[in-house]
Amino acid sequence: MAWVVVAGLTVGLAAGSVRFGWDRDNVIAPLVTTLGDLRTVPALVLAAVLADRSGLTDGLAAALATVSVGVLVVAWRIPTDRLRGIVRQSVPVLGVAAVFDLVAGLTLEKRLDDLLAAEAILVLLPAFLGTAGALGAILSSRLSTQFHLGLDDATPVPSRSSMRNIVDLVVLAVPVFVVGALVAHLVAQATGQSSPSLADLVVVTILAGGLVTVLMVFVAYYTTMGAFRFGLDPDTYGIPMVTSTLDLVGAFTLILALVAVGVA
């Protein structure tokens, strides 16, 4: 259900970027990742409710799994070279991304008691992970565009042009994470949720955000650069690996920062 909405919004944003002259690297990648998070969670809740009320859950699951495998087999063997290449490059990286996201969920589940002790952290968590993923997506998209257009060399050591993009994203990350902490604290106070002090929450967010930003730069650059150097499509590899890796490590660094500050 979620992918239908996200796919439609992606096409709309791409068309709008061309029509209105928006910077596609700064608009499409972060908005699509954010909207994906926004639509996926309600879709999962709705699907769980429908499955719980249906007496045909097992049969429906088997049918959907069969159809999915059939579609994948057809797409894998499709005669069009370009489409076949997209499918064969996308499936492995999306599979790895799914595993990373599952491990991230398991990490959060294991420390759920710590998160429930400061409910503002649960308010902050989706915004924190979404922000980290959006920033990484912007960097990966920018680098991919530069490599494709020959404006930058995909070298193991980032060039000056790549470093400018990296510095821009690092500078942008600090105020964005701080604003996220402020909003999470205000929302928690307004809804009667437990929260550490504002100072503690800001420190937790900056510590976790700093660690995540370092990893975001590393994963975004070397995934995009590596894909380009090996003749693969960096757009296919960069953003999925960045967002899924940051989901995993972002959850871990947030919990680590909670422990370091003494909130958990």
Please place each PLM-identified region on the residue numbering.
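Helix-coil boundary and interhelical linker segments in multi-pass alpha-helical membrane proteins
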Residues: 45-58, 109-123, 186-199, 256-264
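Alpha-helical transmembrane segments of multipass membrane proteins
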Residues: 2-6, 10, 36-40, 44, ...
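Transmembrane helix-bundle signature of multi-pass membrane transporters/permeases
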Residues: 1, 29-38, 91-98, 122-134, ...
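Helix-loop-helix junctions within the multi-pass membrane cores of secondary transporters/permeases
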Residues: 135-192
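Transmembrane helical segments that form the transport core of multi-pass membrane transport proteins
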Residues: 85-157
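Juxtamembrane helix-loop transition segments at the membrane interface in multi-pass membrane proteins
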Residues: 8-30, 112, 138-157, 219-239
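Structural signature of hydrophobic alpha-helical transmembrane segments
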Residues: 1-6, 56-69, 126, 205, ...
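C-terminal transmembrane helix pair
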Residues: 173-264
